[in-house]
């Protein structure tokens, strides 16, 4: 499991083997969960013989056949892949299964977009009225804003606010005809 390989395609094909699959899948989950930080470790419960041999090769430490769980430090896995294939762990994972997701970054961006939608709701002409506050709390509290964001329909919120802004404020103006609101 050591030694540098020249041809990246065929050399990296070994990483699709049984000994590597669960280890690299666990590493991918961990990196996506932490935003790509090479900190901490991943573990394999009930490892196969092939997995045990890979972990021995990566860590340089013998593990008996009776071992129930194997743990590998992500930094050690990254260093081993750099030594063996001249590729970092994130690069190998992207080559095998596509780009890594930055889940913390995605959550942060979604939270910021949700805050912008809330600001749009709060800027509505009727923001001080109880019916509007009830509606705003309902679509904020039941997950509607998040669903709209995730399916790419966030633009509907400003549209809805614009339509509701056309409704008259009591003692403000005469009522608008229904076709104007439609």
Please identify what each model-predicted range represents.
Residues 1-182:
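Nucleic-acid enzyme cleavage-core boundary/entry regions
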């Amino acid at each position: 499991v050591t030694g540098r390989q020249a041809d990246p395609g065929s050399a990296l094909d070994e990483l699709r083997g049984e000994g590597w699959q669960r280890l690299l899948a666990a590493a991918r989950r961990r990196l996506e969960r932490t935003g790509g930080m090479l900190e901490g470790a991943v573990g394999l419960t009930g490892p196969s013989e092939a997995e045990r041999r890979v972990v021995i090769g990566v860590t340089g430490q013998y593990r008996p056949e009776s071992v129930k769980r194997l743990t590998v430090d992500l930094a050690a896995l990254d260093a081993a892949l750099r030594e063996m294939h001249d590729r970092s762990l994130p690069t190998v994972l992207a080559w095998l299964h596509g780009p890594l997701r930055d889940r913390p970054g995605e959550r942060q961006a979604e939270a910021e977009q949700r805050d912008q939608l809330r600001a749009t709701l709060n800027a509505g002409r009727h923001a001080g009225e109880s019916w509007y506050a009830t509606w705003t709390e309902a679509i904020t509290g039941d997950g509607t804003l998040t669903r709209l964001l995730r399916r790419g329909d966030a633009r509907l919120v400003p549209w809805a606010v614009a339509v509701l802004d056309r409704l008259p404020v009591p003692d403000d103006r005469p009522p608008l005809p229904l076709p104007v609101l439609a």
